[in-house]
């Protein structure tokens, strides 16, 4: 009898532990993925709420109303955006649109606030008594809408007709100040957009690009980590390198001769970085990439960002060599590439990107205020200082001179990434960088650049325009 009671107790304990484990896992999953599940377009609770609530306003950091609602006499709610078309187009991807064509914009990802799911019971009762539609909360963003418009205008001036992306953030706080994706569209007439144009796609957060030579920042960090003599060691660049029977060329078949890490970084020497990758091995390079967030599952509070990839299979010597300068199967979004530059600027510390500054009820009661959070420490402060020096040399004497702004200490890295689009070989131009005298980092991508061009001639001038605008904001 005692033995039987013991078995029952053991079974009860096992079941209790199992339910506790399931409960803990459930709460953990809700904490991580809850908002993503909640904002799913077919959530019946959300769809029902949208019929009975006037969505709150969305404002930029200066109080400019980016989206508001108009209610007709028959109770029909219409979402209204800024009167200036260029301003509407500049922020459409970060906001989203009322038709739900843009995935994971503020309009959808902040549904819980905009449609009043956080509203208290007394506010709900008041709305029922008066018979009026309840109003959702107002969301203030960290972005500067004028900066977004300036970025769009720079693209139109310097890369007319090109697709691309740009993002700007405060590297000390993680605040996203600007985010623009091209092609863009007018949210007031989104039904006229051709599906084939990919205009609904937010390239900043949803489009993982081949990073090209911007990834040399990670390779250089790996060298500094594993090789005590990395700064002084020289490798020989002959203009081409044969690995596994395949030839790796430098841009224009340039031959740099004996070259150290700083000069190789400044001149963006592919041969040198292929040799660095081969000498340190795939494991060391992958670990460095993962310290910067590659192969991570990005679960940021305010943004849905596509994961970045450092490949873990099919790692031939040729693929490892190509990885050294950001080719092979490595991919990263412009948002993540911006975080790489931001980590260097912030002494090795990568901040979580944040987009929501404040949420307030229609009566002004604060529901939420922004808080900064460290995402990860990518490298030591000393390593970050060395890389900052290298990135400064890129802008003063290397491939990124067109990003220079008088009166600002700009550091950066250019990239020209070979990839394909609809089966056609193309090259994308990239620039990542930051300013040392003001806390801003950025990433610019220009897609399908012309033959003979690179990130230094396409993306860097747009970065220069952005930095110049930021300088005048101070």
Question: For the regions a protein language model found, what residue spans apply to each?
Answer:
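Beta-lactam-recognizing serine transpeptidase/beta-lactamase-like catalytic domain environment
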Residues: 62, 126-127, 172-212, 218-448, ...
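Periplasmic/cell-envelope proteins involved in peptidoglycan metabolism and beta-lactam response
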Residues: 1-192, 199, 208, 233, ...
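Active-site scaffold segments
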Residues: 216, 338, 460, 464
């Amino acid at each position: 009898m005692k033995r039987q009671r013991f078995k029952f107790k053991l079974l009860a304990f096992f079941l209790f532990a199992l339910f506790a484990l399931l409960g803990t896992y459930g709460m953990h999953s809700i904490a991580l993925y809850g908002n993503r599940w909640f904002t799913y377009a077919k959530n019946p609770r959300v769809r029902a709420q949208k019929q009975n609530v006037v969505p709150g306003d969305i404002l930029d950091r200066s109080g400019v109303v980016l989206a508001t609602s108009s209610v007709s006499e028959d109770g029909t709610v219409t979402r209204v955006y800024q009167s200036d078309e260029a301003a509407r187009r500049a922020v459409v991807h970060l906001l989203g649109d009322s038709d739900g064509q843009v995935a994971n914009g503020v309009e959808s990802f902040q549904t819980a606030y905009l449609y009043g799911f956080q509203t208290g019971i007394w506010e709900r009762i008041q709305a029922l008594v008066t018979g009026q539609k309840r109003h959702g909360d107002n969301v203030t963003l960290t972005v500067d809408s004028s900066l977004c418009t300036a970025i769009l205008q720079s693209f139109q001036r310097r890369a007319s007709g090109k697709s691309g992306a740009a993002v700007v953030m405060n590297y000390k706080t993680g605040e996203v100040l600007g985010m623009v994706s091209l092609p863009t569209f007018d949210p007031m007439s989104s039904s006229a957009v051709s599906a084939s144009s990919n205009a609904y796609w937010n390239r900043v957060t949803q489009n993982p690009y081949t990073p090209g030579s911007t990834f040399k920042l990670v390779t250089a960090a790996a060298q500094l980590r594993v090789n005590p003599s990395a700064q002084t060691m020289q490798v020989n660049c002959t203009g081409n390198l044969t690995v596994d029977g395949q030839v790796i060329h430098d841009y224009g078949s340039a031959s740099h001769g004996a070259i150290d890490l700083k000069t190789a970084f400044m001149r963006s020497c592919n041969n040198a970085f292929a040799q660095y990758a081969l000498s340190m091995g795939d494991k060391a390079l992958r670990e460095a990439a993962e310290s910067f967030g590659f192969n991570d599952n990005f679960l940021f509070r305010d943004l849905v960002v596509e994961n970045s990839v450092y490949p873990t299979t099919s790692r031939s010597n040729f693929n490892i060599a190509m990885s050294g300068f950001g080719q092979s199967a490595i991919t990263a979004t412009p948002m993540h590439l911006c975080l790489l530059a931001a980590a260097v600027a912030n002494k090795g510390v990568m901040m979580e990107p944040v987009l929501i500054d404040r949420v307030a009820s229609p009566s002004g009661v604060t529901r939420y205020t922004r808080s900064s959070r460290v995402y990860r420490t990518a490298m030591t402060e000393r390593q970050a200082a060395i890389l900052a020096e290298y990135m400064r040399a890129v802008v003063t004497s290397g491939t990124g001179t067109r990003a220079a702004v008088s009166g600002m200490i700009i550091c950066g890295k250019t990239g020209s990434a070979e990839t394909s689009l609809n089966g056609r070989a193309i090259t994308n131009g990239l620039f990542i960088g930051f300013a040392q005298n003001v806390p801003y980092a950025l990433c610019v991508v220009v897609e399908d650049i012309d033959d003979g061009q690179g990130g230094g001639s396409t993306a860097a001038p747009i970065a220069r325009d952005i930095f110049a605008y930021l300088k005048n904001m101070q």
